[in-house]
Amino acid sequence: MNKFKFFIVFLILSLVFLQNEYAFGSSLNEELSYYSVEYDNAKTFKESIKQKNIELTYKIPELHTAQIKTSKSKLNSLIKSNKNVKFVNPTCSTCVVEKSVKTGKNLNNKKNGSHDLFDRQWDMRKITNEGKSYKLSPDRKKAKVALVDSGVNSSHTDLKSINKIVNEVPKNGFRGSENDESGNKNFEEDKLNHGTLVAGQIGANGNLKGVNPGVEMNVYRVFGSKKSEMLWVSKGIIDAANDDNDVINVSLGNYLIKDNQNKKKLRDDEKVDYDALQKAINYAQKKGSIVVAAVGNDGINVKKVKEINKKRNLNSKTSKKVYDSPANLNNVMTVGSIDDNDYISEFSNYGNNFIDLMTIGGSYKLLDKYGKDAWLEKGYMQKQSVLSTSSNGRYIYQSGTSLAAPKVSGALALEIDKYQLKDQPETAIELFKKKGIEKEKYMDKKHYGNGKLDVYKLLKE
């Protein structure tokens, strides 16, 4: 009998051991994924993930939001055992969505004066009334413009007013796939040649002229050479606001999914990323900053469910909603693009109650019509694309809504200085809409918002 009892006990213990061994082994073999988490208490959250041996990969303390890397089993355990965790979803990433064309031409204008390049800046000549707005600029420029973007070439001869650079990209970059990303907070390299393009439209002051030449610019780098986490963008906005920037330019984004009918903690949408972005924008507004965002470059009506849902492979019957973010969020000045004839660019997103205003971002209509060779040889590129500063220290033609938004950001900084509207974002926006926008008869609300940017009109008293 005793032998039988001993055998039973031995068998039970063996089964328990085997179950634990199996569970441990499966945990080791489980795929690790990245998740965005919203929590209540920072200390409790930190202790919880430490206890469960979950890796913390990114955090935004101001928003009570973080990114973790873990297995599904550990994630489920964290959610079930921790009331401090509010919501969790797979982390959403973003990418720069400009249509990039290899022109084979980089302009190196060392031999030419600024007048020669300004002649080629048909877009800047239009919105400044042939440069007349420069003469109306305030003598002392105190306003600061932040760029949440891919970095910048601060040694470019036309971008001497770059003051501060904050690298938001963590060590090893996007999900550990970029070994050349050190995580150094001062690292500035613009590997995508995007932030440098944007900076030129705001404050270039040399051979090329931005809308607000010489304005102080601060750059919050949220891209390496690949994608960016949307949480990095939110962190960039938070840091820009904390640094007392008057305007924060965001010429990037993604189509974020949010299901307002879903009340579950573990989400299959992107609520945490969406909410973090909205909270970051609200935070910036309370700090006195104006967030300016470019619309997407897909030429779709964002208010048509079928069109925008297609961007994320969703059918129109789902309760999930897709948002062009951050352009479609609250407390954002949303900017679309027009071409050389002041008509909406073919790539610029639109929709009812979506756009605040338009300005020039260029077009590729003639490229699509005649092909690349004719586009380059017959001067169509110079006619329709926007000339800006390049990360290689030269200049390059490009088109996209990303080149429209910074014109508005630079103009807002001019207005803030001119009319002494520091830390008055709502007043500044209201005045801007009254003085800085011109509306042609054909400009309907759905495609053009309130109209097109006029910097000369904005500054003329």
Swiss-Prot record:
<protein>
    <recommendedName>
        <fullName>Epidermin leader peptide-processing serine protease EpiP</fullName>
        <ecNumber>3.4.21.-</ecNumber>
    </recommendedName>
</protein>
<keyword id="KW-0378">Hydrolase</keyword>
<dbReference type="GO" id="GO:0006508">
    <property type="term" value="P:proteolysis"/>
</dbReference>
<dbReference type="InterPro" id="IPR008357">
    <property type="entry name" value="Lanit_process"/>
</dbReference>
<dbReference type="InterPro" id="IPR036852">
    <property type="entry name" value="Peptidase_S8/S53_dom_sf"/>
</dbReference>
<dbReference type="InterPro" id="IPR023828">
    <property type="entry name" value="Peptidase_S8_Ser-AS"/>
</dbReference>
<feature type="active site" description="Charge relay system">
    <location>
        <position position="149"/>
    </location>
</feature>
<dbReference type="InterPro" id="IPR022398">
    <property type="entry name" value="Peptidase_S8_His-AS"/>
</dbReference>
<keyword id="KW-0720">Serine protease</keyword>
<feature type="signal peptide">
    <location>
        <begin position="1"/>
        <end position="23"/>
    </location>
</feature>
<keyword id="KW-0645">Protease</keyword>
<dbReference type="InterPro" id="IPR037045">
    <property type="entry name" value="S8pro/Inhibitor_I9_sf"/>
</dbReference>
<comment type="similarity">
    <text>Belongs to the peptidase S8 family.</text>
</comment>
<dbReference type="InterPro" id="IPR000209">
    <property type="entry name" value="Peptidase_S8/S53_dom"/>
</dbReference>
<feature type="domain" description="Peptidase S8">
    <location>
        <begin position="121"/>
        <end position="459"/>
    </location>
</feature>
<keyword id="KW-0865">Zymogen</keyword>
<keyword id="KW-0732">Signal</keyword>
<dbReference type="InterPro" id="IPR050131">
    <property type="entry name" value="Peptidase_S8_subtilisin-like"/>
</dbReference>
<dbReference type="InterPro" id="IPR015500">
    <property type="entry name" value="Peptidase_S8_subtilisin-rel"/>
</dbReference>
<dbReference type="GO" id="GO:0004252">
    <property type="term" value="F:serine-type endopeptidase activity"/>
</dbReference>
<comment type="pathway">
    <text>Antibiotic biosynthesis; epidermin biosynthesis.</text>
</comment>
<dbReference type="InterPro" id="IPR023827">
    <property type="entry name" value="Peptidase_S8_Asp-AS"/>
</dbReference>
<dbReference type="Pfam" id="PF00082">
    <property type="entry name" value="Peptidase_S8"/>
</dbReference>
<comment type="function">
    <text>Protease which cleaves the matured lantibiotic from the modified prepeptide.</text>
</comment>
<dbReference type="Pfam" id="PF22386">
    <property type="entry name" value="PPI"/>
</dbReference>
<keyword id="KW-0614">Plasmid</keyword>
<dbReference type="InterPro" id="IPR055070">
    <property type="entry name" value="EpiP_N"/>
</dbReference>
<feature type="active site" description="Charge relay system">
    <location>
        <position position="194"/>
    </location>
</feature>
<feature type="active site" description="Charge relay system">
    <location>
        <position position="402"/>
    </location>
</feature>
